[in-house]
Amino acid sequence: MEIAKKAEIIAVGSELLLGQIANTNAQFISKELAEIGVNVFYHTAVGDNPERLKQVIRIAEERSDLIIFSGGLGPTKDDLTKETIANTLGRPLVLNDEAFRSIEEYFAKTKRTMSPNNRKQALVIEGSDVLANHFGMAPGMLAEHGSRLYMLLPGPPSELRPMFENEAKPLLLKKLGSNEKIVSTVLRFFGIGESQLEADLEDIIDAQTNPTIAPLAADGEVTLRLTAKHADEKETERLLKETEAAILERVGEFFYGYDDTSLVKELSKACRQNGITISSAESFTGGLFSEWVTDLSGASQLFAGGVVCYSDSVKQHVLGVKAETLAESGAVSKECAKELAAGVRKLTGSDIGISFTGVAGPDPQEGHAPGRVFIGISAEGKEEVHEFNFAGSRTGIRKRAAKYGCHLILKMLDQK
């Protein structure tokens, strides 16, 4: 089939039109399609109404040769996407045995009774390629009709994303007749803003052809997605490594990992590799740092314990902060952060103690504006306190502080 040059994404679900959820699926699919040279020209959202969906399909067929639908594949009466598309294409829905077995196994495993309407989820458009759903029950499908491709994907992002990456994208490339190997890698950076990163890499980004470079900033981090394509897979890898090396030569000090990793995952890995234990004293972060660390498997190997020390009494009587420190410098201070880190390290017997004290907002505290944060680190022969002024919501400030905590310990371990 000739490569599709015009793609359209149709998100189905009244909850989108009511503003109850954001259409993050369209953003994800557009980014993935751009990497394989397919241009998305239209995003459409339509409610759970078959007549309006038919109208949207007719419009899409006039201007697009790849039409991707997300949502409406569930078991309820308002999940009408595949029924409407099957009717439009003049094809029946047939039971997919593999999908039905998967649904039966799910209910047997969870010891729940399967409802008759769950069978509906195993129905697929006759003649379509079935996209397995390893994270849910409703399979996706890719149907070819005339000069167009119709792709149906589930609505939940936790199901749609792996299905697209592992099932739909490879099949789509095959359908489009591309023999190029497309490989992507994501470089993750922390401690540098998107504008500064792009300024440092301006000439490299401006000159991009193959690989392409796509920057993205989110939650205080910056990522660069590098995507290379070539008929020879080894050449694709070489192109990626060459560009990665040029990037890291300039901003390598802010780089911390690849692809789907995170700061806390890298921290956990580094601590376990070095046989280091850590502990935390958290005031305004309220246990967020310790929650992140203990969410990961193997946390008992590295996390000695944590104290949520919101009150001055706990700071003083549990962690040993001096009364005069609290009286003279206050709880939100460099001095308090230093004593908290040392206190929790001593209390738990860990190799490294980290503390978080600050103002999450929205109101000021002790004369400090929201976003004023002190992070203390205590290790054998080394004590340091870092001061920050963050902006954003209460939740955003707390998350930013916890991320910087991971970052600072990683930097300390790198220096050993």
From Swiss-Prot:
Signal peptide: none annotated. This is Putative competence-damage inducible protein. Pfam families: CinA (PF02464), CinA_KH (PF18146), MoCF_biosynth (PF00994). InterPro entries: CinA, CinA-like_C, CinA_C, CinA_KH, Competence-induced_CinA, MoaB/Mog-like_dom_sf, MoaB/Mog_dom. It comes from Bacillus velezensis (strain DSM 23117 / BGSC 10A6 / LMG 26770 / FZB42). Belongs to the CinA family.
